[in-house]
Amino acid sequence: MKKILAEIAYDGSMYHGFQIQPTKPTIQGEIEKALMKINKKKIKIHSSGRTDKGVHAKRQIITFDININIQLNNLKKALNAILLKPGIKILKLKHVKNSFHPRFNAQKRKYSYCILNSDNYYPWESYQAYYVNKKLNINNLNQMAKILIGNHDFTTFSCIKDKSKSKFRHIHSAKFKKKGKYIIFEIIGSSFLWKMVRSIIGTMLDIEIKNESISTFETILKSKNRNLARTTAPANALFLDKVYYE
């Protein structure tokens, strides 16, 4: 039995999240079905984390054990032949130690959020972006982003259904970048609470759109009160960019 690590990318718009659900299409479900076609036996995959319904990934990490003798390049081609139509692609395969776990061995995770901040765009450019009509001040947004850096209790930006014992998370970096008609928010953290990034983005944008003070965001963060968080930004503009390992 060999353990294989796979880097995968996917369009989350067609799926009800990563984690398998009996009656709904999911990323995990599609990959496990593809593996079963090749292996002829059920294979369970493990991931670095579970993305929500509608969220995309540029480089999600999964592992699985396989007992057939097949070259990695041939396995990659076979999987992509099955998966590309449902919007999932295997980017890379490699062998790893049996002790490796994509979630527990992960050191950091990077997410990005794409904001379309221009009236000059084609309709399809908004499919994986959040359209904001008002011209945003990137300096104001970056002042709020700086407040996130460090170790904080993110109860305010957690979902009531999140079962994490601790709401403390360490944020290594958080910044907004202008990229043509888009503003991209990039955040790197040890890990994230359920819907945390989208709640943060929605709150920062609401404060900026309403011309409220930067200090409002810090007050909301420190309140540890979910009711003070603003609108949760939509999932279609969120990407899991990268998972970092030692």
Swiss-Prot record:
GO biological process, one term: tRNA pseudouridine synthesis
Enzyme class, broadest EC rank: isomerase
Binding site for substrate: Y111
Keywords: Isomerase, tRNA processing
Top-rank taxon, per record: Bacteria
EC number: 5.4.99.12
GO molecular-function terms, A-Z: RNA binding; tRNA pseudouridine(38-40) synthase activity
InterPro entries: PsdUridine_synth_cat_dom_sf, PsdUridine_synth_TruA, PsdUridine_synth_TruA_a/b_dom, PsdUridine_synth_TruA_C, TruA/RsuA/RluB/E/F_N
Active-site feature positions: D52 (nucleophile)
Enzymatic reactions: uridine(38/39/40) in tRNA = pseudouridine(38/39/40) in tRNA
PANTHER family listed in its UniProt record: PSEUDOURIDYLATE SYNTHASE (PTHR11142), TRNA PSEUDOURIDINE SYNTHASE-LIKE 1 (PTHR11142:SF0)
Family stated for the protein in its record: Belongs to the tRNA pseudouridine synthase TruA family.
Biological role stated in the UniProt entry: Formation of pseudouridine at positions 38, 39 and 40 in the anticodon stem and loop of transfer RNAs.
Name under which the protein is recorded: tRNA pseudouridine synthase A
Species whose genome carries this gene: Borreliella afzelii (strain PKo)
